[in-house]
Amino acid sequence: KPEICFSFYNEKIFIDLINEIKNLQFEGYSLFIDEKGIIIIGCDEAGLYYGVVSLMQIVKGSLLNEKKNLIKKCKIIDYPDLKYRYYHESPGWGRKKEEKEKVVKWYKEYIKNFVAGQKFNMLCFNIDNQFTFSNPDLNTKAFITKDQYLEIAEFCKDHFIEFIPSLETGGHFNWVPKNKFPQFFEDGFTRQANVSHPHFYKFIFPVMQELIPEGCKYFNICHDEWWASPSADVTDKLNGIPRKEIFLKYVLDQYKWLREKGIRPMMYGDMLLKNHNGDDPGARKGLYEITKLLPNDIIIINWSSGVDPDSNKFFHNLGFEVICASNGFRPCVSDRNIVSGFGMLCYGFSFLMSGIVNDDFTLNYGYTSLLRTADYAWNIKNDTGFPVQEFERNKGKNVCAIGSVKPNPHRSSAFQIISLRKYVNSNLKDITGAELKISSAKNQFGFIPMEILKPKENEEKSLIVLNSEEKPIDIEINEPFSSIYFLHGCYIPKEKREEFFKQSSNFIWGVPIATYTFVYEDNTWERTEARFGLNILDISPPNLRSRYMSDIRYFWEGENDKEQPAFLYQYEWVNPNPNKKIKKIILQKTDTEAIAIIFAITARNVRWEEK
């Protein structure tokens, strides 16, 4: 734990800093760095935590500059503008076929780096058929146990994040197997719950109870998109009862059930708005009229601001706290003084990262949208609401680099270029039809010395291509290193691109297109993967914005000889066993349509502790 050491500083410095922050809002902090040391003072425990988060961002930024690993003097006084900084995850992991055993480990890393690490303070976890319920008939796709779920919830608590259970119990009821529970589905709809069934409450409330961890403060009851895609004969009444009364009764009954447990409900606002989903002809007619009858201590998650620009004001004027959270980044500049929170609905796409499901749509949910949302939620009062694209142009490259820095306590300042001369097997023109306009020689890439070979000086071979026609490539090393840097990219034939994107339905954390296996002198090994959208991408991506990825230390940008933009991506693997000699690196393709291409490899030496 941090300690105050007055031998380093004059007591007046502490008193001045404390006086400067004592009137700050909750979660504020002061960070002071000079040649003597570092002081972090938090308004509360969360503020102290965010001060450390900012310090680590500064440290990581300094570590990227190999020529000048210095932390500059600074004084920061900072606090969030909003009470709620909301990150909503609807993990579609139950549909994934691979790597399920790594989900909890990866998700905890994700929370630390991308949720808490970007100073979100709410994580709404919209889990349904991925959860292992006590009722076995619900578990057709389950793979997260209750213990694992509670482990994630506790991890959030440790990182000052409110963990919010969320369950779709109305309009998106298709997580429940219809063949097992047909009585709880309303006729005329594919996914609508029949909440007026006499036994529905006996079914749904025990299910909700299983998702509530100890100390839970909020529960998102959702209620978006009720009665969607009705058959032609559906009216605004069900069994003679107005549907708006059915909807109101159900929300109020859930509200009462949660409040008796000391839990505050949250819900989406689209069904409560005349100009969004609350007044369509047929089943939804007049639904919005119930809004004024709801308790205004329900927190409204408003994803409707793009459809109804006045929706934040509408809810605010009725006394509701409003969290403006949309599909991707959608600023609410005119409402900055009335919303209580801001956030993003991610649906598992941002976990997959950049451009992984297709080349355009999922960028709305990708890495830079996540970063921009976090920045806006913290600084909304003075933020002009500039778009994600502007954020990418001005800050994307540096922010992505900072996020990629990994702990490496044995890092040395010395490097060794691993010569690929004996291993190269092709050139870029033979693979893609175009060659890069890049100086082939030893150069600095993100302050790391790397060597790209000249094809003409090496029998027209300058890189390692991993495709279905090639055997694994074994690169001899026989030295200990603290980390290894890869300068790589990939190529996906145009006619195979659509098929490649289908792989995203199998994997949780990017699609692995190649494996890099490190074999030690004792024949034990470690492995990392080149994961599309995470640390590797097309050399010439169809959507250039995809290049901003979460696990690339640096990207080279230029063009090929066809005047097309081109990029190479630098990825660092940190060796967990720096005391062992790495005998060899095995490079191997995975079973996808993508072709991984390695241009250069550099190793960082080990800094041995003095004895």
Language model regions located:
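Acidic, contiguous N-terminal accessory segments
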Residues: 1-46, 54, 58-77, 267-290, ...
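Feature activates predominantly on carbohydrate-active enzymes
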Residues: 22-266, 547
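Flexible loop/turn segments at secondary-structure boundaries
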Residues: 95-96, 130-134, 170-174, 227-230, ...
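Substrate-binding groove of N-acetylhexosamine-processing glycoside hydrolases
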Residues: 31, 66-73, 85, 108, ...
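Short conserved micro-motifs at the rims of enzyme active sites and ligand-binding pockets
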Residues: 17, 311-315, 355-360, 497, ...
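An acidic- and aromatic-residue-enriched active-site/binding cleft used to recognize and process polar
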Residues: 45, 92, 127-130, 166-170, ...
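Short, hydrophobic/amphipathic alpha-helical patches that form generic packing surfaces
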Residues: 46-61, 354, 363-376, 487-491
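N-terminal/edge-of-domain interface segments
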Residues: 392-611
